[in-house]
Amino acid sequence: MEKIKLIKTLVFSIVVTIGTSLSAQDFKKLDKSPLDIAAYPSNYRESNKELKIIYSRPQLKGRTLSKLAPNGEIWRTGANEAPELTLYKDFYFNGINLKAGSYALLTIPGEKEWTIILHSELNAWGSYFYKKENDIARISVPVITTSDSLEAFSIAFEENDKNITMHMGWDTI
């Protein structure tokens, strides 16, 4: 009888303590540019991913793309920290053999083409401390415009002809 009373008292104390602790937490609000992940293969049933990118998704909110990602300037390719591209196997990128591992993704927007940069400096806030000597690889890609506007910056992967293409979209590009 005493054991049961002791156990009931203990359980009640734990429940009250946990309830009080949870209600006392001060959780941060959702970030204005929430994190997202794009992976290949994109099918959620496929657990053997070949690559993934973690990035933040800024939104236009009435602003222009050229104001948020100015032409000719290094851009963090999203918001907050520079995106982190993780390769789970070796890949060729513009003729360069990239070893499996993680790389920062930066870009230089342009009117007709963008330069995509894979960089060794991880965990970098924005592109403020960018050093060209830490570039691993660069490639220039043409700008393709569309009539539809995309409010939030987005990244997706697609396989074509046994290659994996990364698509980045924001506003009308």
Question: Where are the regions a protein language model picked out?
Answer:
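Primarily secretory-pathway and cell-envelope proteins
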Residues: 25-76, 127-173
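Short loop/turn segments at connectors of secondary-structure elements within structured domains
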Residues: 18, 47, 99, 110-113, ...
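Mid-length scaffold segments of soluble, non-membrane domains
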Residues: 76-125
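Generic structural signal for beta-strand residues in well-ordered domains
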Residues: 15-17, 96, 159
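Short glycine-rich, polar/acidic loop-and-turn segments at beta strand-coil junctions
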Residues: 16, 57-59, 89-91
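Alpha-helical interaction segments
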Residues: 17, 65, 92-94
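Bacterial Sec-dependent N-terminal signal peptides
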Residues: 1-27
